[in-house]
Amino acid sequence: MELIIPCLVAFAASFLTFFSGFGLGTLLLPAFILIVPIQEAVLLTAIVHMLNNLFKIVLVGKHIDWNIAVKFAIIAIPAAILGGYCLDLVQDFDSIHAYTFSNEVHEITYVKIILGLLMLFFASVEFIPTWKNIQFPPKLLPIGAMLSGFFGGLSGHQGALRSAFLVRSGLSKEAFIASGVFIAIAIDATRIPYYFCSFQQQNEMGSMNLWAFPTLCAFLGAFIGNKFINKVQITSVKIIVEILLTLIATLLITGLL
């Protein structure tokens, strides 16, 4: 049961991306936070995110605009390392406050507040149509690459920023999708080894079974959805998911998670 519930949660969160209108990382991070410590949750989300995009790149890779994709990735990669470093940094800060609730001690920490606020912000960006459709001029592409890489390394939230800065770059629909997938893989391939090295040094990697199987189930959810389901958005599901994301983020910020 200890393993079945995390696997079901991971599979369901990944599968819901095809009905809720939210991105894979936006849903998986809070789902994994319910299962494992924060840093491991960020790592597991990154692994599933990259596996899913490696599957996509096989299908759309021929459409990559290498000029824009490489320019974006070159800036995003060091920014992702910086984001990962900042995650390490705030993780080591002392807790802000500790309190007892239901006979359990809960801590409000900087890393919980930061990730909780980022979860709230990016969930709102993907939920509110006017926010989701924000676009930036091509001249700001380097800034977009830096921001996308940094927040990708810090919390995994990279897709919304990447799209907002790429959408006016003159790319065809196919090139936009393919280039975005390539950039996402570049960021994930950078931050995942960094996370592994950092967490192993801090002895913060949990039991292999406790995160390997949920990670596999999350990938299976994304793979099955990609393979067999036309992506549709159901408004009621989107609203319910937004409420759940807000609840999890609030619990994280207040130290209850």
Q: Model segments located where?
A:
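Selected transmembrane alpha-helices and immediately adjacent juxtamembrane segments
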Residues: 1-35, 125-180
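Structural signature of hydrophobic alpha-helical transmembrane segments
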Residues: 2-3, 32-50, 106-117, 146-156, ...
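Hydrophobic/aromatic positions within or immediately flanking transmembrane alpha-helices
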Residues: 42-43, 70, 112-115, 177, ...
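Selective hydrophobic functional segments
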Residues: 43-102, 189-234
